[in-house]
């Protein structure tokens, strides 16, 4: 499964696909690697991921529990904090038009199995910032909650502490005003429809 860091180039310009656009032979795969890493991807009926080069629709969104991990550009290890129980985006890629559906599914699953989803804490593209801003300002079905940084700049409790490298790189001292500084939750409406349609394929 080919994965890249969070980068949704063209998200807002593309025609966003919905459940109604899913072909009969296309499914949603969910692969849970021991409760620490989870992948959401387009699959065939057997749960095998589709191919970026051979299939018309392919894509994957991967999320992880907050942890100490190496930054994408080097060997330096940085803690992410508890992030108020939210999962963290680790990588994304999708055929044009098919990314948003996977993203909604990831947020819903992270809400069902945790306290929501937050952007990559260390590296987010300019295009991805627009995506998160869209969730923050345009999606009434998505809720956003502020996270603190690792220095407790906003609140005393440490449970909401979360690495804010991406937000601070983007906005400096105004990091708390950015969509990158928050976690997002969403009712599982899309997942419920997929389950009713028999379109979920789960693997471990």
PLM features: residue spans?
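Secondary-structure transition/turn motif
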Residues: 41-56, 88-94
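Conserved acetyl-CoA-binding loop-helix of GNAT-fold acetyltransferases
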Residues: 94-110
């Amino acid at each position: 499964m080919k994965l890249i860091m969070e980068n949704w180039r063209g998200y807002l310009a593309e025609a966003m696909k919905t459940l109604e656009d899913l072909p009969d032979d296309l499914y949603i795969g969910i692969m849970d690697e021991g409760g620490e890493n989870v992948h959401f991807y387009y699959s065939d009926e057997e749960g095998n991921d589709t191919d970026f080069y051979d299939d018309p629709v392919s894509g994957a969104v991967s999320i992880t529990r907050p942890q100490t991990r190496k930054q994408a550009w080097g060997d330096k290890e940085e803690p992410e904090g508890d992030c108020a129980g939210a999962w963290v985006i680790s990588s994304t890629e999708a055929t044009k038009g098919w990314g948003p559906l996977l993203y909604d599914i990831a947020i819903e699953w992270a809400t069902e199995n945790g306290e929501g989803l937050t952007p990559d804490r260390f590296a987010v593209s300019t295009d991805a910032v627009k995506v998160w801003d869209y969730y923050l300002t345009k999606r009434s079905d998505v809720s956003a909650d502020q996270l603190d940084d690792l220095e407790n700049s906003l609140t005393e409790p440490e449970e909401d502490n979360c690495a804010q490298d991406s937000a601070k790189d983007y906005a400096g001292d105004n990091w708390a005003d950015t969509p990158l500084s928050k976690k997002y939750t969403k009712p599982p409406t899309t997942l419920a429809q997929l389950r009713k349609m028999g379109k979920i394929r789960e693997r471990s």
